[in-house]
Amino acid sequence: MTTTHIDQVSVSTQASVYFDGKCISHGVTLADGTKKSVGVILPATLTFNTGAPEVMECVAGSCDYKLPGSEVWLKSKPGDKFSIPGNTPFDIRVTEPYHYICHFG
């Protein structure tokens, strides 16, 4: 099921903007201290580097992603999630706005 809203959170009002505006997100902290980001990636092919482990959840649009050591692009659509280990690069390819929640840790 696709997450449609997150209750009882603190939201960073200043956006994090990456890749010349191709990725824009806002940090979210839940009441229990859990951190997430909510954002959008505009059409592009990008390489991200994780710090902590991440779970990417697609809430609208779609993307293709490729994890390290793989040459295979996998598809993520609304309701799908994929995991990336910490301190790891991954590639993402977007042909339409991809709206996501990034779950950290």
UniProtKB/Swiss-Prot annotation:
Entry keywords, A to Z: Glycosyltransferase, Transferase
EC number(s) on file: 2.4.2.1, 2.4.2.2
Catalytic EC class: transferase
Source taxon at top rank: Bacteria
A GO CC annotation given for this chain: cytosol
Gene3D superfamilies linked: Jelly Rolls
GO terms for MF: guanosine phosphorylase activity; purine-nucleoside phosphorylase activity; thymidine phosphorylase activity; uridine phosphorylase activity
Keyword Transferase recorded: yes
PANTHER family per UniProt: PYRIMIDINE/PURINE NUCLEOSIDE PHOSPHORYLASE, PYRIMIDINE_PURINE NUCLEOSIDE PHOSPHORYLASE
The protein's role, per its UniProt record: Catalyzes the phosphorolysis of diverse nucleosides, yielding D-ribose 1-phosphate and the respective free bases. Can use uridine, adenosine, guanosine, cytidine, thymidine, inosine and xanthosine as substrates. Also catalyzes the reverse reactions.
Similarity comment: family membership: Belongs to the nucleoside phosphorylase PpnP family.
Protein name per UniProt: Pyrimidine/purine nucleoside phosphorylase
Organism: Albidiferax ferrireducens (strain ATCC BAA-621 / DSM 15236 / T118)
